[in-house]
């Protein structure tokens, strides 16, 4: 288990008393991110894990869906539809880098839609302020997920509902 953002910031002091740079706070955030994606049980446990590490007005931006703003929207408009579609979704951090208070995280997502397994890669750019994410922009190709959905007709209603909800949501 990783420390909370407050603990990570409290502990962000070198042994000589000098404050640590932003990279250490970002490293704590990335460790939490890796833990959160490694073995989520469901949408709620996933969101509960991330909640203390997200700004109240966090912006989540990615292709194919409208931006998601706020913790509640993260839960209801991002995580819940995603885990409804891919109940066994999990991810592995393959690498990361930081520039100041921005992390670039390479994430390999794996799961099953219907009976179709898929693997999808993304690079998330996460802006971190005071130990919490204020914005996440995902660079991804959703083709592997879409192919799994297309090959699993029983998943179509769930997928279509999530897409329609996204279209109805204001930008």
Report each predicted region and the residues it spans.
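Generic detector of well-ordered alpha-helical segments enriched in charged/polar residues
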Residues: 27-34, 47-51, 75, 147-150, ...
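Hydrophobic alpha-helical core bundles mediating ligand binding, dimerization, or RNAP-core interactions
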Residues: 30-37, 54, 74, 78-82, ...
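A solvent-exposed, acidic/Ser-Thr-rich amphipathic alpha-helical stretch
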Residues: 47-101
